[in-house]
């Protein structure tokens, strides 16, 4: 509280001194401060605020398909001794290094960059970057990201600039939303001439909080906009991400004060099949919600449609399919590619070594089945299945009677519903009663295999 009062007193002094001192008060990156000395304070009529992570810059988050939901929640938990994924500078640092070798649009949101440049060039506008990342840990890194971008793009002195770059000062609040609202309140008090305030953010709950904040202000003069931005993200290379996660877990275990905070990593059983892309997973999730809304007497709710990814199994988890069938699917039954045992084994090696993504297979989803869970699991009240048909003239293979889209829930490194789902797939003609969809849904899948990383109790605990 004393730190906060001191911060407020500095703000009051800044207000009396003039020269846009509020920018100095909140700015976190000395090299990024650009005070518009040539513009009188009373001439500032607009404040434009840009979030950094996934709004302006493609900050990498954990790749959902790589981890069980339990582990994903652990990795992103701020209660871990090292603060979790979002408090670990290494992931952001890795993304910045990758950005040096990529086109501008790969790592930076071109639409937001354009808006930011227009904001900075407008004489009546103050433009700032505002992020909930902690100032003490990340200010140099975000400064480095901006400077790297300008150097890589060969920007002029006034291109891709902001008046200030503001990170979270823990003296104000440890909560990002509250911190951002305090900053906006201070700017509104400092610049009574403000007539417009626009804030861009990728998180809907933040946008909703800002709208509530603006509604609570008694400022009829102010035209405000809380603008949701589609999350802009890029994953790190898979092997690099996994290596960094393992290192993060080792650090966590070395810093943990209690054994309950320690955990090891282990793989779930390997699964082989046609792995749905994220967009197709989303389409099928929406279809389930629409179906449940139509069901008479059932209140609408949003089921957790398994864990990523949904897939069409070729075999029971933990089991393989014949190498010849792998070669046939991989080559779309081009006999020239598997006319010898050596060629078959070569394709099989590629299949098991490479990440899914090279072999694309399209399906049409025609039917849906929603079944009450066999063991009435609270986390999984329903089992959901989709019947799929491969595209014409495309060789496909499965050990099951039909091509069925499904998924799993995981408990530690075990597939929690393995027996139930496998039994359904084997006896699908008798056990599953299909409901035809109004319209078929085209989906995109990758022929491949995957296993998730899971958290298990630490063996040294």
UniProtKB/Swiss-Prot annotation:
Pfam families: HAD_SAK_1, YMR265C_C. Transmembrane segments: none annotated. GO terms for biological process: box C/D sno(s)RNA 3'-end processing; rRNA methylation. One of its GO terms (cellular component) is nucleolus. GO terms for molecular function: histone H2AQ104 methyltransferase activity; RNA binding; rRNA methyltransferase activity. This is Uncharacterized protein YMR265C. It comes from Saccharomyces cerevisiae (strain ATCC 204508 / S288c).
């Amino acid at each position: 509280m004393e730190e906060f009062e001191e911060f407020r007193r500095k703000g009051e002094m800044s207000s009396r001194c003039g020269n846009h001192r509020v920018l100095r008060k909140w700015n976190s990156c000395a090299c990024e401060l650009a005070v518009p000395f040539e513009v009188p304070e009373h001439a500032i009529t607009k404040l434009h605020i840009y979030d950094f992570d996934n709004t302006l810059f493609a900050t990498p988050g954990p790749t959902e398909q790589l981890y069980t939901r339990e582990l994903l929640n652990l990795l992103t938990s701020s209660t871990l001794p090292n603060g979790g994924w979002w408090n670990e500078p290494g992931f952001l640092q890795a993304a910045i290094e990758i950005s040096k070798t990529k086109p501008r649009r790969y790592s930076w949101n071109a639409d937001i960059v354009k808006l930011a440049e227009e904001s900075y060039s407008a004489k009546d506008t103050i433009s700032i970057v505002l992020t909930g990342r902690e100032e003490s840990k990340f200010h140099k890194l975000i400064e480095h990201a901006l400077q790297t971008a300008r150097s890589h793009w060969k920007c002029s002195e006034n291109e891709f600039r902001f008046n200030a770059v503001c990170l979270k000062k823990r003296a104000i609040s440890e909560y990002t939303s509250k911190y951002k609202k305090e900053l906006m309140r201070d700017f509104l008090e400092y610049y009574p001439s403000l007539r417009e305030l626009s804030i861009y953010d990728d998180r809907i709950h933040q946008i909703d909080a800002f709208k509530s904040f603006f509604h609570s202000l008694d400022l009829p003069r102010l035209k405000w906009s809380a603008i949701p931005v589609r999350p802009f993200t890029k994953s790190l290379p898979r092997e690099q991400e996994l290596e960094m996660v393992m290192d993060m877990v080792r650090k966590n275990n070395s810093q943990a004060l209690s054994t309950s905070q320690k955990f090891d990593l282990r793989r779930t059983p390997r699964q082989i099949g046609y792995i749905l892309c994220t967009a197709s997973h989303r389409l099928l999730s929406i279809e389930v919600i629409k179906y449940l809304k139509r069901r008479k007497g059932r209140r609408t709710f949003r089921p957790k449609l398994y864990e990523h990814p949904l897939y069409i199994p070729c075999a029971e988890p933990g089991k393989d399919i014949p190498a010849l069938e792998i070669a046939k699917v991989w080559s779309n039954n081009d006999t020239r590619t598997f006319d010898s045992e050596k060629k078959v084994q070569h394709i099989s090696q590629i299949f098991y070594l490479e990440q899914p993504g090279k072999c694309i297979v399209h399906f049409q989803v025609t039917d849906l089945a929603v079944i009450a869970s066999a063991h009435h699991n609270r986390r999984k009240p329903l089992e959901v299945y989709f019947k799929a048909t491969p595209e014409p003239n495309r060789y496909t293979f499965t050990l099951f009677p039909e091509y069925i889209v499904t998924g799993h829930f995981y408990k530690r490194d075990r597939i929690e519903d393995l027996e139930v789902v496998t039994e359904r797939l084997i006896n699908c003609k008798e056990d599953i009663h299909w409901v035809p969809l109004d319209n078929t849904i085209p989906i995109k899948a990758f022929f491949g295999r995957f296993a998730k990383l899971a958290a298990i109790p630490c063996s040294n605990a």
